[in-house]
C-alpha cells in the first residue's frame, strides 16, 4: 500500500522543515573521526562503526568477552555527519579549501561577474527572497596561470587536496589489527594498478597521467577533496534537480543533503525548471561533494527551449556563470558530430540523451558542425581558469539493449578520445561518459574501447541497464551492469533510481538508487581486489556468525532498513540477542548448528587427545616420573 501522496505545498513545507531543523547526525553506534595529514588543514573525516564484544567463555554469572575493533568507513556526508558541527543552510558550509587556494597565490577575486546572465540575475531584486544570502566573491586564475589539479600534478606538486585524498582512500585500514578482518581474496583487476597503500605521491602520479581526476573548482571551497579513477575506490554519482513541472529549491537542497548521507560521492544538478541559477547557488554553498551540471540545459532555457536558437555566445555565458558559482565538472556533448547523426536513424530508440538530442537537432537545423566541438579549445580555456573538470558526454549512448555497441556509439567515443587530448593540452581534467543500455555479454567491450581510444581517462557510466523489461526496478537492472563495468575498470557509476523512465525521483527514490549503487561499487572493489575492501564484509560475517544483531544492523549500508526487517518478526529486545532469526527459527538455524558442530568437534579433539595421553602413559609403564633418557 503506497503512502498518501503529498500536495506540492506539503512537499515544499516538509522540505523547508527539514532544512530549518537540520543537524549533524551520526549513523547508529557510529562516531565521526578525523585523521590529520602533514599539510596545514588536512583533516580527513571518516565514520567509525563501534562494535560490541564477542562472548568467548566464562559462566553466566561471569562471562568472558573479547573486544571487536571499530570499523572505519568512507564518509561522504561532510559536516552533516558530525553531530558536533552546527548546521545553518542559510549560511552554507565552512570553506574548507579556501586557505589552500589562497596559499597558492595564483588566483584573483573578480570585482565584476564575467557572465551577463549572472549580472542580470543579481540586479533583479524580485529574486531577493529566493537568493542565497551569503554570495561568494568568485575567483579565477591570474593572467597566464592555470589553477587545475592536473597542472599542479604535472609540475610535481603534491597539493593538500592530494594528501587529503590519499588518507581518505586508505579508509583508515591501517587501524585494523585483526587478521580475520584483514583477510582478503585476490582480485581480478583487468590491468588496474592497485597499490597496497595509497600515498599522496601515487595520487599525484595518477592525476598527472590523466588516469584520475580531482573535481575541485576554486569557487567551491566547501567541497571535501575526492578522486575519480580506476585505481581508486569506485565512486557513485547521484542526480538531483528541479523540472518545469515539479520540485523546488528547498526540495533540491534536501535531496542534496540526503544524497551525501547515503553515500553520493558527487551530485549532478540537472535542473531544467525556473530559478536554475538560484537553485544551484543554494546547492553549491551547502555541498561537501563535487557538483556537476549539464550546461546545455540552462543554455536552452535562455533561448526559451528552442534548440535551433542556441548560440555559442549563450553557451559560453552559461559556462562562465556556472564556473564562477563553483560547478566542479561540466558534461559537454561535444562528440555529437553532424556526420554521426544519420548513424542513429536505424536505431530502435534513436537518440535518448537529452543533451545529445539537443545538439543533434541544432546540427541538423543549421547543417553545421556541433558548435561545442568547434569551440572546444575555448571551452578548455574557461575550464582551466577555474579548475572545472570536463565530463565528455555520450550524447549517442544506446537507449535500448538492441542499440548497444553500435556504430554511432563508438564513433562518438573515438571523438571523445580526440577531445581528451586537446583538453590535456590546457591542463584540464577529463573523464568520459558511457552508456546506457547494454546486455551483460557486451559490457566489457565498452570498457576496453574506452581505455584504448580515450587514453585511460576515467570512465563514468549510467548503469548500464542490462535488460529493458523492468520499469520501476531499473535500479536493479542497471545495478547489475554497474557492478560488472565497475569491476572491469569504470571509475564512477551514475545511479539509476526506481523512477528511471517513469518520473522525477523523490527523496526515497534517491536513497534506493544510492544504496543499490553503493552495493554495485563495493562489489566491484571486492572483485578488483582493492586493498581493505573486504574488511567491512569480514566484520559483518563475524557479527552474523556470533549473533551480534546490533552490530549486523550497524555494519549494514542501510542500518535502519536492516533493523526494520528484523523487527517485523522479532521486535522484542530478546530478539536482538537470540541465536536465530525468523527465517529458520531456533531449531534450524545453520549458523547455530555450525557453532554446535564446532563446539562438539573441539570437545572431541580434547577427548581424543586425553585418550592418546592415557594410552601413552600406560605404554610408558604408568610411572609418574621417567628416567631422563626416556623423557
UniProtKB/Swiss-Prot annotation:
Could you provide one GO biological process annotation from this protein's UniProt record?
thiamine diphosphate biosynthetic process
Question: In Gene Ontology terms, what is one molecular function of this protein?
Answer: 4 iron, 4 sulfur cluster binding
Q: Which cofactor does it need?
A: [4Fe-4S] cluster
Give the cofactor note. Binds 1 [4Fe-4S] cluster per subunit. The cluster is coordinated with 3 cysteines and an exchangeable S-adenosyl-L-methionine.
EC numbers on record: 4.1.99.17
Q: In which pathway does it act?
A: Cofactor biosynthesis; thiamine diphosphate biosynthesis
Q: Which cysteines are joined by disulfide bonds?
A: none
List residues binding substrate. Answer: 239, 268, 297, 333, 353-355, 394-397, 433, 460
Which keywords describe this protein according to UniProt?
A: 4Fe-4S, Iron, Iron-sulfur, Lyase, Metal-binding, S-adenosyl-L-methionine, Thiamine biosynthesis, Zinc
- List where the protein spans the membrane: none
- Give Gene Ontology CC terms: cytosol
The chemistry this enzyme catalyses reads:
5-amino-1-(5-phospho-beta-D-ribosyl)imidazole + S-adenosyl-L-methionine = 4-amino-2-methyl-5-(phosphooxymethyl)pyrimidine + CO + 5'-deoxyadenosine + formate + L-methionine + 3 H(+)
Subunit description: Homodimer.
Q: What does this protein do?
A: Catalyzes the synthesis of the hydroxymethylpyrimidine phosphate (HMP-P) moiety of thiamine from aminoimidazole ribotide (AIR) in a radical S-adenosyl-L-methionine (SAM)-dependent reaction.
Q: What is this protein called?
A: Phosphomethylpyrimidine synthase
Organism of this sequence: Shigella dysenteriae serotype 1 (strain Sd197)
Tell me the gene name: thiC
Amino acid at each position: 500500500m503506497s503512502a498518501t501522496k503529498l500536495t506540492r505545498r506539503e512537499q515544499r513545507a516538509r522540505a523547508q522543515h527539514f532544512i530549518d531543523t537540520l543537524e549533524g547526525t551520526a549513523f547508529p553506534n557510529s562516531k565521526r573521526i578525523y585523521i590529520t595529514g602533514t599539510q596545514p588543514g588536512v583533516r580527513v573525516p571518516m565514520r567509525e562503526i563501534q562494535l560490541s564484544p564477542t562472548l568467548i567463555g566464562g559462566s553466566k554469572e561471569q562471562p568472558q568477552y573479547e573486544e571487536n575493533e571499530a570499523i572505519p568507513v568512507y564518509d561522504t556526508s561532510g559536516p552533516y555527519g558530525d553531530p558536533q558541527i552546527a548546521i545553518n543552510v542559510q549560511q552554507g558550509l565552512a570553506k574548507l579549501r579556501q586557505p589552500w587556494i589562497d596559499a597558492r597565490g595564483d588566483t584573483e577575486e573578480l570585482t565584476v561577474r564575467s557572465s551577463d546572465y549572472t549580472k542580470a540575475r543579481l540586479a533583479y531584486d524580485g529574486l531577493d527572497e529566493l537568493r542565497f544570502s551569503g554570495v561568494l566573491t568568485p575567483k579565477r586564475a591570474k593572467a597566464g596561470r592555470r589553477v587545475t589539479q592536473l597542472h599542479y600534478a604535472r609540475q610535481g606538486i603534491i597539493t593538500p587536496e592530494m594528501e587529503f585524498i590519499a588518507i581518505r582512500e586508505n579508509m583508515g585500514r591501517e587501524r585494523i589489527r585483526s587478521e580475520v578482518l584483514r583477510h582478503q581474496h585476490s582480485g581480478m583487476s583487468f590491468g588496474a594498478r592497485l597499490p597496497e597503500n595509497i600515498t599522496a605521491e601515487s595520487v599525484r602520479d595518477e592525476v598527472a597521467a590523466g588516469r584520475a581526476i580531482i573535481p575541485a573548482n576554486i569557487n567551491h571551497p566547501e567541497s571535501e577533496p575526492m578522486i575519480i579513477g580506476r585505481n581508486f575506490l569506485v565512486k557513485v554519482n547521484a542526480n538531483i534537480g528541479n523540472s518545469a513541472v515539479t520540485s523546488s529549491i528547498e526540495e533540491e537542497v534536501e535531496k542534496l543533503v540526503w544524497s551525501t548521507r547515503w553515500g553520493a560521492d558527487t551530485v549532478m544538478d540537472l535542473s531544467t525548471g525556473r530559478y536554475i541559477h538560484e537553485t544551484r547557488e543554494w546547492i553549491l554553498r551547502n555541498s561537501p561533494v563535487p557538483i556537476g551540471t549539464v550546461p546545455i540545459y540552462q543554455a536552452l532555457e535562455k533561448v526559451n527551449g528552442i534548440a535551433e536558437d542556441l548560440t555559442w555566445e549563450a553557451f559560453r555565458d552559461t559556462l562562465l556563470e556556472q564556473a564562477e558559482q563553483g560547478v566542479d565538472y561540466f558534461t559537454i556533448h561535444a562528440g555529437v558530430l553532424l556526420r554521426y547523426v544519420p548513424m542513429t536513424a536505424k536505431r530502435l530508440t534513436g537518440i535518448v540523451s537529452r543533451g545529445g538530442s539537443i545538439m543533434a537537432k541544432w546540427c541538423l537545423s543549421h547543417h553545421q558542425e556541433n558548435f561545442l566541438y568547434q569551440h572546444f579549445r575555448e571551452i578548455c580555456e574557461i575550464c582551466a581558469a577555474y579548475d572545472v573538470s570536463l565530463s565528455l558526454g555520450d550524447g549517442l549512448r544506446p537507449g535500448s539493449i538492441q542499440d548497444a555497441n553500435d556504430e554511432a556509439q563508438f564513433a562518438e567515443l573515438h571523438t571523445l578520445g580526440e577531445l581528451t587530448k586537446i583538453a590535456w593540452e590546457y591542463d584540464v581534467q577529463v573523464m568520459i561518459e558511457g552508456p546506457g543500455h547494454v546486455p551483460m555479454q557486451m559490457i566489457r567491450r565498452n570498457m576496453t574501447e574506452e581505455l584504448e581510444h580515450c587514453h585511460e581517462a576515467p570512465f563514468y557510466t549510467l548503469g548500464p541497464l542490462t535488460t529493458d523489461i523492468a520499469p520501476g526496478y531499473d535500479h536493479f537492472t542497471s545495478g547489475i551492469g554497474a557492478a560488472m563495468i565497475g569491476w572491469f575498470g569504470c571509475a564512477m557509476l551514475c545511479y539509476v533510481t526506481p523512477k528511471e523512465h517513469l518520473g522525477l525521483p523523490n527523496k526515497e527514490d534517491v536513497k534506493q538508487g544510492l544504496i543499490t549503487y553503493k552495493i554495485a561499487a563495493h562489489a566491484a572493489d571486492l572483485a578488483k581486489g582493492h586493498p581493505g575492501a573486504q574488511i567491512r564484509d569480514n566484520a559483518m560475517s563475524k557479527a552474523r556468525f556470533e549473533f551480534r544483531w546490533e552490530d549486523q544492523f550497524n555494519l549494514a549500508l542501510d542500518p535502519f532498513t536492516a533493523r526494520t526487517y528484523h523487527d517485523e518478526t522479532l521486535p522484542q529486545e530478546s530478539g536482538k540477542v537470540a541465536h536465530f532469526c525468523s527465517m529458520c527459527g531456533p531449531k534450524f538455524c545453520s549458523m547455530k548448528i555450525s557453532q554446535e558442530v564446532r563446539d562438539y568437534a573441539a570437545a572431541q579433539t580434547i577427548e581424543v587427545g586425553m585418550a592418546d595421553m592415557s594410552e601413552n602413559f600406560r605404554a610408558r609403564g604408568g610411572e609418574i616420573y621417567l628416567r631422563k633418557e626416556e623423557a
